[in-house]
Amino acid sequence: MTDIILKADHLKKVFISGKKSMTAVDDVSFELKQGECLGIVGESGSGKSTIAKMITHLESITEGQVFLKGKDITNARGKDLRETYQDIQMVFQMPMESFDPRCTLGDGIGESLRNMGISRTETRKRVENLLERCGLDSEYADRYPHQVSGGQCQRVAIARALAVSPEI
């Protein structure tokens, strides 16, 4: 299993509201090997985003397990969860909604770097470099989400995901 970097095993997600329940994901399994690309395809509302959110711990898992490099991360907490975030990043469909409107885009990109203990000066350098790699001028670091277009915000979201050099 050394070349498998991500494994989802019989994932299930049930949302409960009062006495009603709705199964969003039912028995999904897959493996992602080093160097592979994986596409999850389906109709609107079929559970694609929910699967990604379960893998990244943004949504709880009702049943099943997730393994990262052979380690069960299904119930990861604290330090283990922070390490997981360094290996797996997600770019949201609606990037504008994933940024704090009170913070600059540079703050949003640099948050994970600062959480890793990187100095503000070094964080700023990395943020500017990431923006340029994603086709935006470094001055976008000082803008707020409402000051950029949807496409520009998507590029900023990609820069944020790349900030910690994730494997996935």
Predicted regions and their residues:
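Helix-to-loop junction immediately C-terminal to a conserved catalytic motif
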Residues: 56
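Hydrophobic anchor residue at the start of the ABC signature
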Residues: 158
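Conserved ABC transporter NBD signature motif
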Residues: 64-72, 84
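Conserved ABC ATPase "signature" region
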Residues: 72, 121-139
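A short, flexible loop at the N-terminus of ABC-type nucleotide-binding domains that lies
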Residues: 2-5, 14-27, 77-80, 102, ...
